Amino acid sequence: MQPQRNLLLIGLLLVSFMLWQSWMVDKAPKTATPATAESSVPASSGGDVPNQNDASNAKHALLTLRSDVLELTVDTLGGDIVEAKLLKQTEAQGSDKPFVLLEKKPQRQYIAQSGLIGRDGVDNQAERPVYTANGTEFALVEGKDELVVPMTFTDAKGNVFTKRFVLKRESYAVGVDYQVKNVSAQPLEIQFYGQLKQTIAAPEGSSTPGMMASAFHGAAYSSAEQRYEKVNFSDIGETKLDVATQAGWAGMLQHYFVTAWTGKADAQNHIYGKAVSVNADVKDSGEAIIGIKLPLTTIAANSEAVVGTSLWIGPKLQDQMAAVAQHLDLTVDYGYLWFIAQPLFQLLQFLHGLVGNWGVAIILITMIVRGVMYPLSKAQYTSMAKMRLLQPKLTALRERLGDDRQKMSQAMMELYKEEKVNPLGGCFPLLIQMPIFIALYWTLMESVELRHAPFALWLTDLSVKDPYYVLPLLMGATMWYIQKMSPTTVTDPMQQKVMQFMPIVFTFMFLWFPSGLTLYWVVSNIVTIIQQTLIFRQLEKKGLHSRKK
C-alpha cells in the first residue's frame, strides 16, 4: 500500500546516508598516544635505526620535473617529492590553477619519500644524502614518451648511487629506482623503501560543504590477505602496521585522489605504518606515515644493480591504476554494493562516450534503469491495487474475529490465496530497487570523472550541490505530484500529515546533495510519473484502479 511505499522510500534514503557515514567516515579519532620525535626513516629488515630528523645542514636544491599530466618538485636532500601538481585537474571549477596533491608547507605537509636503508644504505641515522643533478628544470619534450631524470650521490667509499625518476606521457605512475655501482671489494646490502608522510590534521576544505559527510581522508594498503584495507590517521600510531606480502601497495587517500607506492610482484615486501612527532596534549598532532619496503638486495663487489618500484600520484582512474598495481583500483570505493556500482559506472562511462556530457549520461542511465525496473513497478502497483480492493474483506475479517490473532492470520492467508494476491508484492520491487539506488549513489560520489563536470546552464559541476537549488525544488515538486496521483487508503490523520510533509523533508535533505545525484532523482521521478500514468490506465481497464480517491 502507499504508506508502506513511502516509508520504504524514507528507509532507502536513510540507509544510503548511513552507508555514506559509515563507509567514508570511520569511527571518531582516538586520543593520540604520546610519542617522541621518531625517525621518519623506517627500520630495515636487519634492525632498527636510531632517531633522526629529515632536516640537514647540507645545501640542497629543488628540482622541477614536468610531464603532460604531472609537475613534481623534488628535493635533492634525500630525493623526496615535496610537491605534486596534477596539470589536468584544476584547483576549483573555472580556475586555471592545477590541483596540488602533494605539498610541503610550514603548517602542514604531504610528501612522498624514498631511500635506501640496510647495512650499506645511504639513508641512515646521521643524515640523508644530498644528490646532484645536471640542472634544476626538466620537461617531457614533444615527440618523446618518457622523461628520465637522474641524480647522483657518491659515498665515502666511492660507491655511486644514482636515483632516477621516470615520468611517462599521459601517466600518473612515476618510476623511482636506484642504480647502485659497488666499487668496493665487499658486497653491499641495501633495502629500498617508499613511504608517504602527511600531517594528521585534515587540510582546510577537505570536508564536503553542507550536511554531507566528509570523504575518507587517511591511509590504505593492499596485501595478499587484505585486498583493500583503510586505516585512519588517528589510529595509525596504535595499529603498528607491519604486514609481509607479495606485491601489494601502501597509499594515502583524499576523496578523488590517491598516492601509493607499489611492491615487488615476485618477492616478499613489508608494508608498515606509524605516527611520528605526536603530542598527546594536541588533538590530531604529528604526522602519519605509511610505506612499503622491498626485499633486501645484495650487490656483489665490483658490480652494479638496479632496485626500485613505481609511485602513483593522481586521480582515481580505475583502468590505469589496475594496470599499475593489483587492487589499486579498489580505492574507488563503491562500498558493499561494488558489484552493482561497477557495471553502472561502466555503463555511465559508455554513455558519456556516446553523448560527451555527464549530465546527459546520467539522464540516459536513469531512463535505462527505470526501464529495466518497469515490469517490477507494474507488478508493485498491480499488487497494491489488488490489496486495496481487499480492504473491505479484511475489515470484515477483523470485525468478525476480533483479537484472535492466530485465526486472523490464518483467515488472511486463505483470503490472499483465494484472491491470488501476494501481500508482499508491493514491497518486493522496492527492495530490489533500493540497492540499485544506493549503488548509483556511490558511483556518482566516487567517480573523479564527474569532478567539475558541467551539465548545462547553471549546473557547471555535477559533483557539488545545485547552487540555486532548482533541482531539489523540482525533486520535491515531482515527489509531491507522485504522491498526489497515487491512490491511498490512509485514514489516520497523523499518517496523512506525515505523508504530506515527506516531499518537504526530502527537498530539504537534497539541498546539499551533489547535483548529479539530484538530477538522477528528478529524472527518475519524471519517468515514474509517466510509468504510473500508463500502469493506472491499464489497471482501470481491468477494474483495479479508479482515478477517484
From Swiss-Prot:
Subcellular location as annotated: Cell inner membrane
Region annotation Disordered: residue ranges?
A: 35-55
Transmembrane helix as UniProt keyword: yes
BP terms from Gene Ontology: protein insertion into membrane; protein transport
What name does this protein carry?
Membrane protein insertase YidC
Give the keywords, sorted. Answer: Cell inner membrane, Cell membrane, Chaperone, Membrane, Protein transport, Transmembrane, Transmembrane helix, Transport
* InterPro entries linked to this entry: Membr_insert_YidC, Membr_insert_YidC_N, YidC/ALB3/OXA1/COX18, YidC/Oxa/ALB_C, YidC_ALB_C, YidC_periplasmic_sf
Function text: Required for the insertion and/or proper folding and/or complex formation of integral membrane proteins into the membrane. Involved in integration of membrane proteins that insert both dependently and independently of the Sec translocase complex, as well as at least some lipoproteins. Aids folding of multispanning membrane proteins.
Organism source for this protein? Tolumonas auensis (strain DSM 9187 / NBRC 110442 / TA 4)
Its membrane topology, per UniProt? Multi-pass membrane protein
**Disulfides per UniProt:** none
Q: List the signal peptide residues.
A: none
Q: Name one Pfam family in it.
A: YidC_periplas
In the record, what terms sit under GO molecular function?
Answer: membrane insertase activity
Is Transport tagged as a keyword? Answer: yes
The primary site where this protein sits is membrane
Query: Subunit structure, per the record?
Result: Interacts with the Sec translocase complex via SecD. Specifically interacts with transmembrane segments of nascent integral membrane proteins during membrane integration.
Q: Where are the transmembrane segments?
A: 6-26, 349-369, 424-444, 462-482, 503-523
Which GO cellular component does the record give, naming just one?
Answer: plasma membrane
The Swiss-Prot or TrEMBL record describes its family as follows: Belongs to the OXA1/ALB3/YidC family. Type 1 subfamily.
